[in-house]
């Protein structure tokens, strides 16, 4: 059974046991999180919510709070100046523990 969840302005297709890197969530490592479920499928026909499904839950456990690999932004002008900036986007890694329909 799989589900499509919404978090951080994005949608993810998850199943029980999946590890997903999502936009940063408030919470400590080992904490529990619940997600809005948009679609459930895998057994017969898929159920689609309008916009979410009532009575369907997807629970996860926070495994890590970290940052992605650094992205470098480099600008150079012909006048001779350069500008180098970096950015590391924070994320939360979640282990999907249950998908209940």
UniProtKB/Swiss-Prot annotation:
Q: Give this protein's Gene Ontology molecular function annotations.
A: rRNA binding; structural constituent of ribosome
Question: How is this protein organized at the quaternary level?
Answer: Part of the 50S ribosomal subunit. Contacts protein L20.
- What protein name does the entry list? Large ribosomal subunit protein bL21
One GO biological process term is: translation
* Keyword line: Ribonucleoprotein, Ribosomal protein, RNA-binding, rRNA-binding
The residues forming the signal peptide are none
The protein's role, per its UniProt record: This protein binds to 23S rRNA in the presence of protein L20.
Keyword rRNA-binding attributed? yes
GO cellular component terms, A-Z: cytoplasm; ribonucleoprotein complex; ribosome
Name the lineage: Bacteria, Pseudomonadati, Myxococcota, Myxococcia, Myxococcales
Q: Which gene encodes it?
A: rplU
Q: Does the keyword rRNA-binding apply?
A: yes
Whose protein is this, by species? Anaeromyxobacter sp. (strain K)
Its family remark reads: Belongs to the bacterial ribosomal protein bL21 family.
Pfam families named in the record: Ribosomal_L21p (PF00829)
